[in-house]
Design a protein with these regions (language model features):
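Conserved catalytic segments around the Walker B and adjacent sensor/switch elements
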Residues: 52-53, 76-93
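Terminal-proximal interaction/regulatory segments of ATP-powered molecular machines
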Residues: 313-395
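Mid-core helix/loop region of P-loop NTP-binding domains shared across ATPases and GTPases
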Residues: 2-17, 44, 92-219, 229-244, ...
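Conserved C-terminal helix/linker of AAA+ ATPases
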Residues: 262-287
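Walker A/P-loop nucleotide-binding motif
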Residues: 45-69
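Hydrophobic residues on short alpha-helical segments
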Residues: 35, 302-309, 327, 348
Length: 395
């Protein structure tokens, strides 16, 4: 029996995939700011340089946008016949010598004669070699240092790398180096600025804020349309993922990829909300110790109302369910467990407790027939698992 098809192009959901510049959603302001740092190099690359910090949480598009802007700039620089190169290095788990060796290695891959022995050389020798190479070729290098946080964590005081690169042009007759540092938290910036020798050169900071839910849903929709076949996902599912991704595009795309893989592996015709709950629950248990033992803290009646939400969601198979549908199951369960049902207004305390516990999200929406009602969703745990755990505690 042939498996149903989910993926049209799975590589487009890989975290390493970088969409082209014209397909990047949002970040127009940040793209313009970064490009404005590059553009003066086209006029006079030997008498202009810049140094800036790109700061923002993991997964908000910093590396993607800096890399794509750098590519666009390099295309333009060829039209101007400028001798400019861009090199991006990940500083994670590397010391200053390894970083400098990687810079020279990247230049060698671009066809330049920057071979240098990998052993028995000091950082100072590597730095001098790079300076001499750029000066003799009258080349301007834009150096992008990614993952600088881990580098700074291992070096509480200013390292030779940061000091020498911020002052790289001081001993040269031309401006031959521009520097971009990519960081994920402001603590790193604070540590860098503790040293006045570096601080005065790194005042230019471009902030990448977390995405809002609407933008994340738009990013997911664009990526899903390219990576997945039509009719295997609903817009509500993408909205569900966007809401639980903490403003991080990388996390949202990873959740979508995992849920799609789960549907594919289980021969499902489409990605369901329950598939998202399953992969999120696995992630939570693995990374954040999210566990159902927190159910013990809920009052007996609140557990029954939560079970009502679970059963209603299982019946409709949707991302969320209405108060009216939940109340139908709530009355049945109250009879099953021999307790008196509360009135709708009296359930507000139970709803609040469930929201605070993290098991349930609730929001009030307009309904087509007029008026407003509460909708409930469960995002962080499989409905089957939650039902089993609740019933075992309600015996």
């Amino acid at each position: 029996m042939q498996k149903p098809t989910i993926f049209k192009n799975k590589t487009l959901l890989d975290p390493r995939y970088m969409p082209p510049l014209n397909k990047i959603i949002d970040r127009k302001r940040e793209m313009s700011m970064i490009l404005n740092r590059f553009k003066p190099l086209l006029n006079d690359p030997l008498n202009y340089s810049f140094r800036c910090i790109i700061n923002g949480s993991i997964g908000v598009g910093k590396t993607l946008i800096v890399s794509r802007i750098a590519e666009k700039f390099m295309e333009e620089s060829r039209n101007y016949d400028r001798n400019i190169e861009v090199v991006r290095i990940s500083c994670a788990y590397r010391d200053e010598i390894q970083v400098m060796q990687l810079i020279l290695s990247q230049l060698a891959k671009k066809g330049y004669n920057t071979y240098f022995p990998s052993r028995g050389v000091s950082y100072g020798e590597l730095l001098m070699f790079l300076q001499n190479f750029l000066e003799s070729n009258k080349m301007h290098l834009v150096l992008i240092l990614d993952d600088i946080d881990r580098f700074v964590e291992r070096n509480p005081k200013t390292t030779p790398l940061l000091y020498s690169l911020t002052r790289f042009n001081d001993a040269l007759p031309y401006s031959l180096l521009s520097l971009i540092l990519i960081t994920v938290n402001e603590q790193t910036i604070a540590k860098i600025k503790l040293d006045p020798a570096v601080r005065d050169f790194l005042y230019d900071i471009i902030e990448f804020k977390d995405y809002d839910v609407n933008t994340l849903a738009e990013i997911l929709k664009a990526r899903a349309n390219e990576a997945l076949y039509p009719n295997v996902f609903e817009d509500d599912l993408l909205w569900m993922i966007a809401k639980i991704s903490d403003g991080k595009a990388r996390k949202a795309i990873s959740i979508l990829n995992s849920a799609a893989q789960y549907a594919f592996d289980n021969m499902e015709p489409k990605i369901a909300p329950e598939h998202v709950r399953i992969v999120i629950a696995e992630y939570k248990e693995r990374a954040e110790s999210f566990n159902v033992s927190e159910l013990e803290n809920l009052p007996h009646h609140t557990k029954i109302f939560l079970l009502s939400i679970v059963l209603s969601l299982k019946e409709c198979g949707a991302v969320s369910t209405s108060m009216g549908k939940v109340m139908k199951y709530y009355k049945i369960l109250c009879e099953e467990y021999g307790i008196k049902p509360k009135s709708r207004p009296s359930l507000n305390r139970d709803i609040k407790a469930l929201q605070l516990s993290g098991f349930v999200e609730a929001d009030v929406r307009n309904v087509p027939s007029g008026g407003r009602t509460t909708y409930f969703s469960v995002n962080l745990i499989s409905l089957n698992k939650l039902e089993k755990e609740l019933r075992s505690r309600l015996k």
